[in-house]
């Protein structure tokens, strides 16, 4: 909820506050941003204002940080002791060190089952896709919205470029690597080019280490209980009923059609 901060600007409370401004990830009407691991879905603004020795008006910091770091920073500001297992750090702490890499992930969003992982260094974004046979435009909650409807219409009419059609509706590459200094919009996938082999291997190893060290839960399939709960939430909505949704839901659809769904629920 929006709060009129200016109304308390002169108060003692305001003078003691540290204000963090950040946003949700990705624009909802941009198909390649929200819920995906490209820059538009990962990069968010972070502005910090307040009475703290680490904050200087107009100072710009280009370090790689995550919103997890905001959590650690606010806990530290409140006087909490940060446990060692946290995968984040206090941005104002005396032991703060700029991160060499930050990580991002996408799993099931609403009823759309997927798994994507990404690691960002200062210059490169590396993306690992796991469901290679599922196009980026697999059925999802935005399918009844104009951007998705337009994209599907253009594809059916053969009016997309070869690159667009392959990117949105074709098989996904296992790996993607983009030079964020030269290719901000991530159009040219460098993963298969020999000149970038060393960077590909470096980022691949960094991501694999993070997956193992963090015990990334996306390594494990969701249980039937979780999938059934998702099916229950969406099964009566037109956008789900008319879609060729992921095969993981087939058992629930078949049981429902055969009147065995109640028995399956027990």
Model-derived features with residue positions:
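Long, internal low-complexity/basic segments
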Residues: 159-175, 180-186, 190-266
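Histidine-centered active-site microenvironments of extracellular/periplasmic hydrolases
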Residues: 15-66, 87, 235-241
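A generic secondary-structure signal for well-formed alpha-helical elements
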Residues: 12, 26, 51, 74-82, ...
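Polar, surface-exposed loop/tail segments
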Residues: 16, 58-121, 188, 196-205, ...
């Amino acid at each position: 909820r929006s709060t009129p901060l200016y109304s308390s600007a002169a108060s003692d409370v305001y003078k003691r506050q540290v204000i963090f401004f950040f946003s949700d990830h990705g624009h909802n009407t941009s198909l390649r941003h929200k819920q995906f691991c490209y820059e538009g879905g990962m990069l968010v603004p972070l502005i910090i204002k307040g009475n703290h020795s680490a904050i200087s008006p107009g100072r710009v910091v280009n370090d790689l940080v995550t919103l997890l770091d905001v959590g650690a920073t606010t806990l530290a500001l409140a006087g909490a002791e940060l446990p060692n297992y946290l995968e984040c750090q206090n941005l104002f702490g005396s032991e703060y060190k700029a991160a060499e890499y930050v990580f991002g992930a996408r799993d099931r969003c609403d009823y759309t089952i997927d798994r994507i992982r990404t690691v960002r260094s200062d210059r490169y974004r590396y993306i690992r896709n796991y469901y290679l046979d599922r196009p980026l435009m697999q059925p999802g909650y935005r399918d009844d919205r104009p951007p998705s409807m337009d994209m599907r219409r253009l594809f059916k009419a053969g009016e997309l470029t070869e690159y667009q059609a392959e990117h949105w509706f074709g098989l996904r590459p296992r790996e993607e690597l983009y030079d964020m200094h030269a290719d901000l919009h991530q159009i040219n996938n460098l993963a298969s080019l020999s000149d970038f082999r060393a960077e590909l291997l470096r980022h691949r190893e960094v991501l694999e280490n993070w997956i193992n060290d963090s015990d990334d839960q996306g390594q494990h399939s969701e249980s039937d209980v979780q999938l059934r709960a998702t099916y229950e939430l969406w099964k009566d909505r037109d956008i789900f009923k008319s879609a060729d949704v992921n095969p993981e839901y087939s058992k629930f659809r078949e049981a429902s059609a055969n009147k065995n769904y109640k028995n399956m629920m027990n």
